[in-house]
């Protein structure tokens, strides 16, 4: 579909929302959130901008982002609000990430930040400013609201109306993987105007609107890595090095390391080991301060346990279901059977599950998200557990 038609379709959809048409846009200072605000203004919404100040210093979540976001609000003629969220970001993200690395997992700060910081802080602000009806961000994802009618014959149905999360149309930019943990209350309040657009169209439209951020380079890293220079620099600032062993699966010691926090499942580079075949990290044992390695052909797993599940587009299943599971951002979702594990304290509630993949998967990484899909629909998701 030509870009003009896609944008017109987006504008028409934005104009169909019922209510007062007041919205606050989460502005990072990047082109995506900038165009989001511009499109909502064009669609006739009463728009205000809000930026969360997460860290001191340079970067998209820091001072640079605040300046660019303020510039966009000035250009569009809308109010700009700044919320000091450094304390909650330290507690929910930085502390949690460091704890994860100490435990030998690879944390996923982006999805946690979306739920526990960005969207929760925006929702809190909206509740305190009752003249604002909706939240909008520049994420590439889509929402089907509980009062909308769509063909959902491929989804399990229990008759309960739910807000449903879908992949963005641009599969190269789809961010639904990082949004699986958003609760129904937030989904019902949120708009993703870029959900039907590609990144290319976003750039074109930003230029058409002469937005100051239209040519701003896209951030290529996690905000923590961007802020500290690299994830290793961030980790080294807070976690002490602790020498340990690198071993094969049979326990044979073949090398040493300076801290398990510098390793992740599947890693090959940076092991500092010369071996007859390339070796990959297959397990990180925090209790023994050990990194276990193996050849790639001996690194696959066919199943994993997923915990802390949030069910999005469906209610928690009561029996095994066939799904596609994505275990890394931008990786392909693979066919699998989801077997519910029930909480004895909550009758018939699936709080974690066993995932059985049709084919062995390389680098199933504890701490990362496993997100369950049915076509474009996000059924739910959770964190990959260290237990097997």
From Swiss-Prot:
List positions binding ATP: 26-33, 52, 138
Q: Where in the cell is it found?
A: Cytoplasm
Among the Pfam families in the record, one is tRNA_Me_trans_C
Coarse class of the primary localization is: cytoplasm
- InterPro entries with a match to the protein in the record: MnmA-like (IPR004506), MnmA-like_C (IPR046885), MnmA-like_central (IPR046884), MnmA-like_central_sf (IPR023382), Rossmann-like_a/b/a_fold (IPR014729)
List site positions: Interaction with tRNA: 139, 368
PANTHER family per the record?
MITOCHONDRIAL TRNA-SPECIFIC 2-THIOURIDYLASE 1 (PTHR11933:SF5), TRNA 5-METHYLAMINOMETHYL-2-THIOURIDYLATE -METHYLTRANSFERASE (PTHR11933)
Q: What does this protein do?
A: Catalyzes the 2-thiolation of uridine at the wobble position (U34) of tRNA, leading to the formation of s(2)U34.
Protein name stated in the entry: tRNA-specific 2-thiouridylase MnmA
